[in-house]
Amino acid sequence: EHIHAHWASTPSTVAYIASAISNIPWSFTAHRWDIAENNMLEEKARTAEFIRGIDEQGLSELASIINEKYRYKLNKIHVGININCRNRDNNFLYGNDNNFIIITPANLVLKKGHRYLIEACKLLIKKGITNFKCYFFGDGYLHEDLLILIKEHNLEEYISIKGQIPHNELLNLYKNKNIDLIVLPSIVDKYGNKEGIPSALTEAMAYGIPVISTNTGGIPELIGDGSGIMVNQKDPLALADAIEKLMKDSEYYKTIAEKGRKKVEDEFNVNKIAQELLNLFEINKKTN
């Protein structure tokens, strides 16, 4: 028997208490904001059999918080995704009305950096590149602010906020070749919030869709090797240049798509990730 909790916040607090009452060994996975907020991490590190971080930056943050004598309990295991049935080819399609289709599947919150993609789209149009559509799939407190920004830049013809859609519908868009590019212009916001390794990127990469994102949070660990295009945060010009290159260079597009798919298949396959986690359970079972 073993208790494992996801998130270093309330779920792991419940697991910590349950373990103390039942005497069943326990462990937890820490993601991102739950590390920054601490959440009794020193005490949890003392009693947990192991702690799983999902990326190098998260692991480093955990190590800086907990006592040195507990750092041996830290392990990095990515969040996996199901890579079955990824039968899309790597050709871009200019899917609807001969337009290149860009989407950002993310909550409308500061750390997702939507405003910088809006500004990048404005730059593309200034360069005469108008054969694209950009859709934001998500909801959040910035909805009205982003609508105002889109209108201020006269981009209603090019950018639409579609709201949240069911996850399976998003995956069907990928599978049915309705999307050419994912752009996630993430930032470290004024509160210090940042990305881990976003599933919005890994899922798209698994379908052979190129991704553009920024050098924040755990993102460099995913695409810093050329498996996607990485730019500096808050840099609309770099975003625009990256989008333009993918739109105009089909061979480059295919190369990025293939590298991205291989990266996810090799390192983020849910079966591989599950086995790594099971191995930790087995190791700790033998020592108890």
Regions found by a protein language model. Give the residues of each.
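Short hydrophobic beta-strand element within catalytic cores of glycosyltransferases
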Residues: 201, 206, 210-213
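Short glycine/serine-rich donor-binding loops of glycosyltransferases
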Residues: 194-201, 219
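Nucleotide-activated donor-binding/catalytic signature segment of Leloir-type glycosyltransferases, i.e.
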Residues: 144-176, 180
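Conserved acidic donor-binding segment of nucleotide-sugar-dependent glycosyltransferases
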Residues: 222-236, 245-251, 266
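Acidic donor-binding loop of glycosyltransferase active sites
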Residues: 175-194, 209
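A short, well-ordered alpha-helix in the C-terminal region of glycosyltransferases
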Residues: 158, 238, 245, 252-267, ...
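A conserved mid-protein helix/loop that constitutes part of the nucleotide-sugar donor-binding site
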Residues: 100, 104-123, 141-147, 195, ...
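Donor nucleotide-sugar binding/catalytic pocket of nucleotide-sugar-dependent glycosyltransferases
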Residues: 35, 41-88
